Amino acid sequence: MAFTFKQFHIDDLNCGMAVSTDAVVLGAWAPLTNAKQILDIGAGSGILGLMAAQRSQANITCIELDDTAAIACQHNIAQSPWASRIRLVQGSIQQLSQAEEYQGYFDHIICNPPYFEHGPQAQLSQRAMARHTDQLSFNELLAAIEQCLSPNGLASLILPIQSLHNFNHLLSQSRLEWVERVDIKSVEGKRANRVLCLLTAQTHRTVEPKVSELTLRDTSGQYSQAMVHLTQDFYLKL
């Protein structure tokens, strides 16, 4: 289906995953202020790359493995106001991260990674690839971020809360460290079901990671003031 934001349009019909609230929240939240080179891992429709282009003056590289999704991503980029600053690489992040030209190249890396680590895969193969870690495990993702992130760079991710324990274990074995964590509650009064993660390649940090919460909707189903403030530059009706 098609999705129109305030400054760009997304056609995600041929992508494994449709435009999601997760992607919008991540794309609006990631701190991109000083970034000059941004990498969007597993770009899909290109939504994160396009949001990053709207929010920064950076050059953006989107990498997408799936052929059909890459075509949709390229189309969405070409139709946007920032086509000159966004380029698409079709292939795997595992391969790109080994290329010498990308070692320590990116100031910011953004990713809404696959999140089903086990269990039955989705019937539709594209959707399965987008949703399951078989194509990109957390271990591979962290290794790629380590390779591609500049020494003072940041990486922004969104994960299901139930994946956090395993993710933290793998993170402890990497050279990356926490900067900030935001637990996301879909509705006021419910338990958090997602977590925004901000990581850095800086080692031996002396500052404790910042921890906070974000509630998306109040008990009546309306967007919370925090959600409105976060996404008002993107959603048409805010």
From Swiss-Prot:
Reactions that this protein is recorded to catalyse: adenosine(37) in tRNA1(Val) + S-adenosyl-L-methionine = N(6)-methyladenosine(37) in tRNA1(Val) + S-adenosyl-L-homocysteine + H(+)
Key words, A-Z: Cytoplasm, Methyltransferase, S-adenosyl-L-methionine, Transferase, tRNA processing
PROSITE patterns named in the record: N6_MTASE
One Pfam family it belongs to: MTS
Cell compartments where the protein resides: Cytoplasm
GO molecular function, one term: tRNA (adenine-N6)-methyltransferase activity
E.C. code: 2.1.1.223
GO BP, one annotated term: methylation
Predominant subcellular localization, coarse grouping: cytoplasm
Keyword Chaperone: no
Transferase listed as a keyword: yes
One cellular component term from this protein's GO annotations in UniProt: cytoplasm
Functional note: Specifically methylates the adenine in position 37 of tRNA(1)(Val) (anticodon cmo5UAC).
Protein family (similarity comment): Belongs to the methyltransferase superfamily. tRNA (adenine-N(6)-)-methyltransferase family.
Name assigned to this protein: tRNA1(Val) (adenine(37)-N6)-methyltransferase
Organism: Shewanella sp. (strain W3-18-1)
